[in-house]
Amino acid sequence: MSIETLVEEIGKLTLTEASELVKSLEEKFGVSAAPAVVAGVAAAAPAAAAAEEQTEFDVVLTAAGESKINVIKVVRAITGLGLKEAKDMVDGAPKTVKEAVSKDEAEKLMKELKDAGASVELK
């Protein structure tokens, strides 16, 4: 299997499957997917981060609320997950529904989820 084929197949994974893949690779090879931090750079980073406006947001489902079925439908539409995976995500709240999306898209997704009855926050 070529690297290009492997990358294409990984690209077809759902968010849940990709997360499971990362965990499996971390366990198998004893590594972490978290980036390494250099001490000198870490001290300067908070000042730089404060000056820059956040451009990517994570949409986090904090609670399903009263209309759980409607929330599951919206989660399925947003993520492309199957019914069981979407239900598990809603039942397991707080869960990240979408990662690293633009501010406009994050606000749109947040509105859709809130309209369905969910409690949502942006990180």
Curated annotation (Swiss-Prot):
Quaternary structure note: Homodimer. Part of the ribosomal stalk of the 50S ribosomal subunit. Forms a multimeric L10(L12)X complex, where L10 forms an elongated spine to which 2 to 4 L12 dimers bind in a sequential fashion. Binds GTP-bound translation factors.
Annotated Gene Ontology cellular component terms: cytosolic large ribosomal subunit
PANTHER family: 39S RIBOSOMAL PROTEIN L12, LARGE RIBOSOMAL SUBUNIT PROTEIN BL12M
Domain of life per record: Bacteria
MF term (GO), any: mRNA binding
NCBIfam families per record: L12 (TIGR00855)
Cross-referenced Pfam families: Ribosomal_L12, Ribosomal_L12_N
Organism whose genome encodes this protein: Chlorobium luteolum (strain DSM 273 / BCRC 81028 / 2530)
GO biological process: translation
Function according to Swiss-Prot or TrEMBL: Forms part of the ribosomal stalk which helps the ribosome interact with GTP-bound translation factors. Is thus essential for accurate translation.
Alphabetized UniProt keyword annotations: Ribonucleoprotein, Ribosomal protein
The name this protein goes by in its record: Large ribosomal subunit protein bL12
Family to which this protein belongs: Belongs to the bacterial ribosomal protein bL12 family.
